[in-house]
Amino acid sequence: MAEKSFKYIILGGGVSAGYAAKEFANQGVQPGELAVISKEAVAPYERPALSKGYLFPEGAARLPGFHCCVGSGGEKLLPESYKQKGIELILSTEIVKADLSAKSLVSATGDVFKYQTLIIATGSTVLRLTDFGVKGADSKNILYLREIDDADKLVEAIKAKKGGKAVVVGGGYIGLELSAVLRINNLDVTMVFPEPWCMPRLFTADIAAFYETYYTNKGVKIIKGTVASGFTAQPNGEVKEVQLKDGRTLEADIVIVGVGAKPLTSLFKGQVEEDKGGIKTDAFFKTSVPDVYAVGDVATFPLKMYGDVRRVEHVDHSRKSAEQAVKAIKAAEGGAAVEEYDYLPFFYSRSFDLSWQFYGDNVGDSVLFGDSNPSNPKPRFGAYWVQGGKVVGAFMEGGSGDENKALAKVAKARPSAESLDELVKQGISFAAKI
């Protein structure tokens, strides 16, 4: 059993880990001071590519093309880049025990890693139907998407079941993006989800109606208000049918499940303060344990502009929280401080020829503006959310770069709105004036 010691350890191999490593390199680290420990076999990469370009039938994205930090226009950190920057990249290494009081991590093979400062960037893991005891959920070709190995399995299944039937369980981010890319791969696609409309945590019924009709026009079948209650398999163990709770049965060659995720915090249970399902941090991503920071999906942090604490699962926050934590660590070493994290919630998605962005908070009353006809070749519409007479959230489908910047400005500024009717009339021009 080997033992290694580092000044800093980043635990994780996703977006936050890559961006934290980049920020350490920017701030300056000595060779041998920093290690990144990941259970994955590849250097940190931009996870959003997995549900988009990685699955395209032509011109598919492949590593090293989307290693961190190309997603934000930054430097691509190849495996050799870490070495050049004096960072030890420790891959295919699963940490099974963390002792925060002893400042040590233990791997599945018994190796011990000591640290002075730890950044927890373990991210999330998908919720699996086997977790809920769904009958037959362990059949072959029932797939999930979180890591590059999952994406490789899906690519192989798409090739093997060319033109076959795919059932997508879940109507959120992953469900929508995967339904689109499976359809682009010419599979027969059916989406199944229990909610009354897709993306219910963000979309209003009006916004969802546009996307559901657009998807239907593209040949995606949508079944709402029910769940997958069981699966039957062929003699070779591959999934054959999906039983729905409402009594219907769907044929399936591939099933892709996207029913949510949970933060990977179990290593730290009982050692660190938690809140809202994540590890509680301050505005610098410091946890309740000295010299331990948590970033990305696992962090429950103060959302300053709303006077609230939240946990955010999105690539934008994963990048920015990682950078904030490292800046805070390095500033403190020099007896200085950085400004508190003041995050503006931001979400986006791309599917088919569509592209939307959302900034702010989706609370209060909402109004739709623009052309939301899903039959139009280039639909362009948006929405505002108004609470207490102020615009608190803004959404746009098909917006230009300048229009999307205007959305961010209006959500940050939270200007007063005379009336909902006036917002409908002004549309994106209201945001452009801020």
Curated annotation (Swiss-Prot):
Domain of life: Eukaryota
GO molecular function: monodehydroascorbate reductase (NADH) activity
Enzyme class, UniProt record, top EC level: oxidoreductase
Gene3D superfamilies: 3.30.390.30, FAD/NAD(P)-binding domain
List of residues that carry Phosphoserine: 416
Catalytic activity, EC: 1.6.5.4
Binding, L-ascorbate: 319, 350
Catalytic activity: 2 monodehydro-L-ascorbate radical + NADH + H(+) = 2 L-ascorbate + NAD(+)
Entry annotated with the keyword Cell division: no
Induction annotation: Induced by cadmium.
Residues binding NADP(+), per UniProt: 173-177, 201, 260, 313-314, 348
Keyword vocabulary terms for this entry: FAD, Flavoprotein, NAD, NADP, Oxidoreductase, Peroxisome, Phosphoprotein, Redox-active center
Similarity-based family: Belongs to the FAD-dependent oxidoreductase family.
Function: Catalyzes the conversion of monodehydroascorbate to ascorbate, oxidizing NADH in the process.
Name of the featured protein: Monodehydroascorbate reductase 1, peroxisomal
Gene giving rise to this polypeptide: MDAR1
